[in-house]
Every structure is written in structure tokens, then in C-alpha cells.
A protein has these predicted regions:
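Structural boundary micro-motifs
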Residues: 1-121
Length: 121
């Protein structure tokens, strides 16, 4: 299965091609027409991989620095100021901190795709 990256980070699947646009499927199953120049084969930054999906490079914030991560319920990206707590250090060590909101959203989209396409036994 091949994934492409919308706006440099968000994983999508290409379902069709028009003259100047692609028909893409997002992780939430919505279809959209987007200009071809917004879709790339590789993400703008690459850190880890989740199945076939390349995740953005994680960010290691310093004390008092802002970063983005997934909310506790994994429904949205939230902006957080790094406070050096035990939980924040765990997030950093597991690569769950991102410099931009779109990178955090890309991580959430990757989780959503992985859940949809996980192998069934």
C-alpha cells in the first residue's frame, strides 16, 4: 500500500488523477480534489515509520518551549509548553512531540490509517 503526503506531512492515498489535480482519500475516509503540487511522495521531514506510513521527525523541546502533540484522547493536536515533567519526558523519548501543528495532525492521521488497515487474524 502506497501513501503520499499532503502539504508535506499529512498521509493520504491517491485514488485518481485529473489533469492538474489528484483525488485523495484522507485518514477520516473523506475524498478531496487537491492540486498536484500539494502532494509529494516523501514527507518534508522523516523520523519514524508506522507500517507503510512515514511519520514526521519528532521534536525535542527545551524547558519553557512550545511544541505540538496529540491530545490525550487522540482526537486533535494541541499546543503545549514543555514543563519537563515525567510525562513530557516520556513523550519526548517516544518521539511524540512535534514542532508544528500539521506534523502532530500527520501523526494522528497515521494512527487513524493504521487502525483502518491493520491486519486481521
Amino acid at each position: 500500500m502506497k501513501f503520499y503526503y499532503l502539504d508535506g506531512h499529512l498521509p493520504v492515498r491517491i485514488l485518481g488523477e485529473e489533469l492538474d489535480s489528484f483525488i485523495i482519500e484522507k485518514s477520516n475516509k473523506t475524498l478531496e480534489f487537491v492540486e498536484k503540487n500539494r502532494v509529494s511522495e516523501e514527507p518534508a521531514s522523516f523520523g519514524n515509520q508506522l507500517g507503510f506510513i512515514k511519520l514526521p521527525k519528532s521534536f525535542e523541546p527545551k524547558f519553557g518551549e512550545d511544541y505540538f502533540r496529540a491530545s490525550e484522547d487522540l482526537t486533535k493536536a494541541i499546543k503545549v509548553t514543555y514543563n519537563d515533567s515525567k510525562y513530557e519526558r516520556l513523550r519526548v523519548s517516544f518521539g511524540l512531540c512535534f514542532q508544528t501543528e500539521v506534523e502532530a495532525l500527520a501523526y494522528l492521521a497515521a494512527l487513524e490509517f493504521a487502525e483502518r488497515f491493520k491486519p486481521t487474524n
